[in-house]
Amino acid sequence: MPDSLVKPSTYSAQGVIMSIASIVDFSEASTAAEHYRPAPEKVFKGDPAQTIYNHYNSPCGQMSAGVWNGEPGQWQVNYTEHEYCEIAQGVSVLRDEEGNAKTLRAGDRFVIPAGFKGTWEVLETCRKIYVVFEATEHT
């Protein structure tokens, strides 16, 4: 179909008109940085300062996407959500509760399923693109 025949907007499942202006382009987003650190009792090594640029939150509140930056350190993680990750920069090691480890480097793409428990260790300052889905009891 020629571009001239494509409708400029469509209706979403919620009946809201969605158009090209609804697209969230991370490179153009002007999202405020959220700075934080894990709770002290969860930190095992270093001072893992972290910054999130949460560029998108779904209207239902179950999905978000953005960019995460982490400084060297190791802390406990307990995922209640499903998270797709793409490492854009740096090196991290993800370990499960049994001590099994996976080294994560720039270019790696993976999903951490809800229920995963273990540690995240940043060896070299890390940048991660993420998409998070938090299921409810009905989804």
Give the location of each predicted region.
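Short acidic-glycine-tyrosine-enriched beta hairpin
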Residues: 99-114
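Short, conserved beta-strand element in jelly-roll/cupin
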Residues: 80-94
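A generic structural motif
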Residues: 95-97, 121
